[in-house]
Amino acid sequence: MDFFYNILVTGCSSGLGKALFNEVHSHDHLRAFAHYRSMTADPFALYGDVNDSNFPDKLDEFIRTRQIECFINNAGVYEGNVLETNLLSQVKMLQVVYEYFAEQKKGRIININSLAGINPTAGESLYCASKFGLKGFSKSLQLEAIGSGVEITDVYLGGVQTRMTEGRDNYDSLMKADDVARHIIDLVNTKSYYVNEITLRKRNESCAS
């Protein structure tokens, strides 16, 4: 498989998405493209609410025009339209991206998931449902992708210092977004092997975070 060059990261306004975009941008051989919900000063970015009915069409046009070779599926919420944002909209985006990559016979999809997609936790039923759903869809897509040239990696994260976790009592002990971003982009930089899933968490962190 050819080396990836053009990378689109969704949900870049803050937190891990912003850290991922900056990490990609720091590598000379990688070209970073960002997605934001609201307009910014970036003239090369993709804009729009992932829950809008026309967003899949905007995404399709963007990835084809920019010849995106790696899609980092990071956009998500903890409260509000949880199922719509974390699952339904992501399924639609992944269908669009996978179809394009399959046509090109190459491409990498990196789904940013959560330990909540592996182990259920009390008080987070909707969030866990959205993450379990993303896991199921991605695992099925991995099977469909065999022989297509498309590689799909699921990243299950423990607690990360982002806007979503600012109110937690243990915020200071959570993983730093910049550190997590470096590990994830290491996957993009790896040509010699394919990782279909990886879990990142602090050594002393419960698997049910």
Model-predicted regions and their roles:
Residues S13, G17, F21:
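N-terminal Rossmann NAD(P)H-binding glycine-rich loop of SDR-like oxidoreductase domains
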Residues D42-N54:
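Rossmann-fold cofactor-recognition segment
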Residues N74-E79:
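Conserved NAD(P)H cofactor-binding loop of Rossmann-fold oxidoreductase domains
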Residues L94, S130:
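Active-site helix of classical SDR
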Residues S114:
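Residue(s) in the substrate-gating loop at a strand-loop-helix junction
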Residues N119, S140-E151:
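Active-site-adjacent segment of SDR/Rossmann-fold oxidoreductases
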Residues V150, D154-V155, D169-S209:
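C-terminal helical subdomain
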